[in-house]
Regions:
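N-terminal Lys/Arg-enriched interaction segments
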Residues: 1-155
């Protein structure tokens, strides 16, 4: 008598987030999306956080990725969750877009953060207009940078 194998477990339910054919799905990455893309024409400087942040919001809203910035789309805690890998891929794309939208002199002042929402929060704390003393400190640091004996590449 042959033994029957138990049936395989059912696939996880298709939710609005796992249906990548849905153009409104925030986890959908279009083929035209590239981690090297600069989202806005005006890069972040110490003076322009307000206008820059509005431009970033518009760009990410247009790409349906604003939830990664404002924290409404959070990383699933279970690595077996079908959204875990999707979240990581989209979050990495948003982090890359943010980093590419920061002027070169400021990139060294921006911490390496793997979470788009945490990076956004850090940028707000450092560069928002109500943080005048920090902006002054950054301008002063930038104004006093010297090459010394470093090569141009190192500098």
């Amino acid at each position: 008598m042959a033994t029957l194998d138990p049936p395989p477990p059912p696939p996880p339910p298709i939710t609005k987030y796992t249906n990548l054919a849905d153009p409104t799905n925030p986890y959908r990455l279009e083929t035209s999306y590239n981690p090297g893309t600069v989202l806005v024409t005006e890069l972040l400087t110490v003076e322009n956080f307000s206008t820059w942040s509005r431009s970033i919001h518009r760009a990410l809203r247009a790409k349906n990725k604003l939830g990664f910035l404002n924290g409404t789309l959070t990383k699933p805690s279970d690595p077996h969750n079908p959204l875990f890998e999707l979240w990581e891929r989209c979050n990495d794309m948003v982090v890359s877009w943010l980093q590419n939208s920061i002027s070169l002199p400021l990139r060294s002042f921006v911490p390496f953060v793997d979470d788009a929402h945490l990076l956004w929060t850090e940028l707000q704390e450092r560069f928002s207009p109500q943080n005048g003393p920090r902006i002054y400190e950054l301008k002063k640091t930038l104004a006093t940078l010297t090459q010394d004996e470093d090569s141009v590449n190192t500098y």
